[in-house]
Amino acid sequence: MAPNLRKSHPLLKMVNNSLIDLPTPSNISAWWNFGSLLGICLMTQILTGLLLAMHYTADTTLAFSSVAHTCRNVQYGWLIRNLHANGASFFFICIYLHIGRGFYYGSYLYKETWNTGIILLLTLMATAFVGYVLPWGQMSFWGATVITNLFSAIPYIGQTLVEWAWGGFSVDNPTLTRFFALHFLLPFAIAGLTLIHLTFLHESGSNNPLGIVSNCDKIPFHPYFTLKDILGFTLMFLPLTSLALFSPNLLGDPENFTPANPLVTPPHIKPEWYFLFAYAILRSIPNKLGGVLALAASVLVLFLSPFLHKAKQRTMTFRPLSQLLFWILVTNLFILTWVGSQPVEHPFIIIGQLASVTYFTILLILFPAIGALENKMLNF
């Protein structure tokens, strides 16, 4: 009998073991769809980004008008740009839901997979930040100025570091050029990291909603989960295309329709919605270095999750107190996102400070404490 090429060819064998014959727990829910959705987001962003880069000019005098030219004169340029800008929002929606799933179901106990995932999140945040600067509108320019300026809070080397990053004494042409280079490069780094992420995942196999070993009950990935993933793609592309076609500027900032002007500061400088929770934490501390450290900690705290897991059960499926705490954390993140979009005045200052303290308290103190308490209550 002739050997099955899919199982014997060195390259096809890898694809087969990752996407076709991969043993998958039979009970994984729709929350396990977000990994593949993130993959399709990345592919969409790279494709639309490549098409946009063909018409973009990374120069302060031409950047704004080159984006306008793409939208006005290039065939379907407006659609490509709208899909790319809103695709970033969907990328972040998917990654936040993906992290939330991992947190709820204790997937962080696969330490290598979890840690590479956080590195992926940080790379994605960096990519989105440098990308936001490229249209060279008012919010692009001032966002770049404010965020890069945060590095000056680093003792001793801060100011030198910022001027080195800028390529001068302010955000200017060299900054835009290097940001474009970085924005082109980083998605490919994300693609590489994704392969590492998947390699670590396939070492252990997927977790499942019950958090128990599922080796006795696994089914092939294809056709069951390929079909389920395609349904997921459809359900994501529908709202994405609707947003890009009907209200493409809903999530953007009106300030970005004004070309960058170093002499006029916008009344409220704020990042895109997906960074607002971290921005609120940054603003809630009146000290510059303290704010920067809190900003970094807001994401880096995720690295501690595996070490703060004190419960004897892996998932929160059968732990009602932890579930309650989890949903309080989610609500708290929504409050932080809302506060980050508001001006720095009473009562938003105090709400932001309380929400920031609550965020770290829940993650660092309450989750381990409640986990230990539940062990006692369940006589573990």
From Swiss-Prot:
It holds the Pfam family Cytochrom_B_C. Heme b b562 binds at H84, H183. Binds 2 heme b groups non-covalently. It comes from the Eukaryota. SUPFAM superfamilies: a domain/subunit of cytochrome bc1 complex (Ubiquinol-cytochrome c reductase), Transmembrane di-heme cytochromes. Keywords: Electron transport, Heme, Iron, Membrane, Metal-binding, Mitochondrion, Mitochondrion inner membrane, Respiratory chain, Transmembrane, Transmembrane helix, Transport, Ubiquinone. It is found in: Mitochondrion inner membrane. PROSITE patterns: CYTB_CTER (PS51003), CYTB_NTER (PS51002). GO terms for cellular component: mitochondrial inner membrane; respiratory chain complex III. Heme b b566 binds at H98, H197. A ubiquinone binds at H202. GO terms for biological process: mitochondrial electron transport, ubiquinol to cytochrome c. Its cofactor is heme b. It is a multi-pass membrane protein. GO terms for molecular function: metal ion binding; ubiquinol-cytochrome-c reductase activity. Component of the ubiquinol-cytochrome c reductase complex (complex III or cytochrome b-c1 complex) that is part of the mitochondrial respiratory chain. The b-c1 complex mediates electron transfer from ubiquinol to cytochrome c. Contributes to the generation of a proton gradient across the mitochondrial membrane that is then used for ATP synthesis. The cytochrome bc1 complex contains 11 subunits: 3 respiratory subunits (MT-CYB, CYC1 and UQCRFS1), 2 core proteins (UQCRC1 and UQCRC2) and 6 low-molecular weight proteins (UQCRH/QCR6, UQCRB/QCR7, UQCRQ/QCR8, UQCR10/QCR9, UQCR11/QCR10 and a cleavage product of UQCRFS1). This cytochrome bc1 complex then forms a dimer. Belongs to the cytochrome b family. Heme 1 (or BL or b562) is low-potential and absorbs at about 562 nm, and heme 2 (or BH or b566) is high-potential and absorbs at about 566 nm. This is Cytochrome b. It comes from Thalassoica antarctica (Antarctic petrel). The gene is MT-CYB.
